[in-house]
Amino acid sequence: MQESQETHMSSHLDEVIAAVSVTSKNRLSNKLLQTALFQPPREKLHLCEERAKSYSSIREYKQAIQELVRCVALTKICYGDSHWKLAEAYVNLAQGYLQLKGLSLQAKQHAEKAKEILANSMESPYYNKTDIFKCSLELFYTLGKALVSLQKFKEAWENLIKAERLSKEMLQCGNIIKEEWIEIQSRIKLSFAQLYQGQKRSKEAFPYYQKALEYTETTKDEKSFECAQVLREMAGVEQALALHDASIGHFSQAHLIILSKEPSPEDAADSALSIARAAVASGMHDHHDVAEKYFQESMTYLKDSEGTEKAKFLSIQDEFCSFLQTIGQKERAAMILRESLEAKIGVFGDFSPEVAETYRILGRADLAQGNNNGAHMKLKKCVQIETFLYGSQDKKTMATQQTIDTLSKISETPVKSKQSLKAKTAFCTSVPQYVTPGKARHSAAE
C-alpha cells in the first residue's frame, strides 16, 4: 500500500514538473526543475534571475517578465520590504515591461515604486553605497526611458540628466569601470536621441544617435540586434533630414543584421519594407530600382502566408502599386490591383475599406484609359461600400458620388446627340422627293 502511495506521489510530482515547464530554446531539464522546487528562497531567486536574463537574451520578453515578477516576490521574502535589492528587482521588472510595446505606464509605476524603496534604503548605514548608486543609476535611466515612451519629455529629460551625471561621478570615483560606463552611456544616449526625435527635433537627435551607435558597437557585437535597432532609428532621422543616401545605407546595414538572426517572415518583411520606403521618400529617379527591389523582397517573405500576415502582404502590395503610379507605371499597378481584388475580399470582406479603395483606384484607372463604362461600374461598387461603412454624408462617399454623377453626365451627352441626329435623319427621309418634269426617277439599283 505504501509503495502504491509513493508511486502515486511520484507520478503526481512528475505532472507538476511538466505543468511548470516552459517550452523555449533554452528550457531547463525536468531534473533541474524538480531540484528547484525544493531550493531555499535565495537559490530560487538566483535561478529566476538567470532565467529572466536568458529569456531576454533570446527576446522572449513575456516569459522574462514572468520570471522578473517571481524575482520581486522572492526578493521580498529574502530581504524584506525596505532593502535596496527590492528596489533593484522593481527596476528590473520595469525594464522588462519596457521591452514590450504599450506597457510603458506599468514600467513607470514599477520604477516609481523602486524610487520609494530606494529612498528608505539610503538611510541605512549597513548597505554598500556603491550598490545603491548603481541601483539609482538604473532607476533614473529606466524612469527616463519610460517617460520618453509616455511623451512626458520634460520629466524624462530630468531623469536622464541625473543618470548621465551619476554615471560620470561613479566613473571618476572608481565605482564603475570604463567598460561599464560605455555600456550605460550607449543606453542613455539612445534615450536622449529618442527624446529629441519624439519632439520632431531631428537635428538635435542625430548626434545622440551617432554616439549611441558608436558606444553600442564598442560594447556589443557590430551585428547585434542592439546595433540594428540604433541603425534603423538613425536612418529614420536621416530620412527626416533629407540625408537619403545615408538613410538607405543604414536601413540596408540593419537589414543584413536582421537577416543573419533568422527572423520571422514578418520581421524580415518589415526590414525590407523600411528600405523601400526610404528609397521612395528620396523622390530620386536613381532610387526607383532600389524601391522596387525591396518592395518585391518584402512581399516575397509574406507571399504564401495566411491570416494577419496575408493582410500585411496585401497592404504592402497596395503601397507598391501606389509607388508604381507615382513613377508612371499606372497600367502595371492597375493589373496588380485587379489580381489582388479576390484575395482582399477573402481577407478583409466584401464591405471593407481595403476593397473600396481598390475599386476606387481601378475606377480611376479605367477613367484615365477612356473606359467610362468600366469606371462607372467600379466607382458604383466603391460608393456602395463607402455608404455602408461611413454613411452617405461622409466626405469620402460624397467625393466618389460626385465623380459618378459627373461621369453619368458625360455618358448622357453622346446619347442625346445620337438621338438628335436620328430625329434629323428621320425628318429628311420623310420630305417628298419632287421629280423634274421630263426626267424619270432613278431607281436605287441605278
From Swiss-Prot:
UniProt-listed SUPFAM superfamilies: TPR-like
Top-level taxon of origin: Eukaryota
Keywords noted in UniProt: Cell projection, Repeat, TPR repeat
InterPro entries from the UniProt entry: TPR-like_helical_dom_sf (IPR011990), TPR_rpt (IPR019734), TTC23/TTC23L (IPR042621)
Pfam family for this entry, one: TPR_8
Record bears the keyword Repeat: yes
GO CC annotation, single: cilium
BP GO terms, sorted: positive regulation of smoothened signaling pathway
Coiled coil regions in record: none
Compartmental location: Cell projection, Cilium
Residues in TPR repeats: 45-78, 137-170, 186-219, 356-389
Broad class of the protein's primary localization: other
Subunit composition and interactions: Associated with the EvC complex composed of EFCAB7, IQCE, EVC2 and EVC.
Record function comment: Participates positively in the ciliary Hedgehog (Hh) signaling.
Protein name: Tetratricopeptide repeat protein 23
Organism: Rattus norvegicus (Rat)
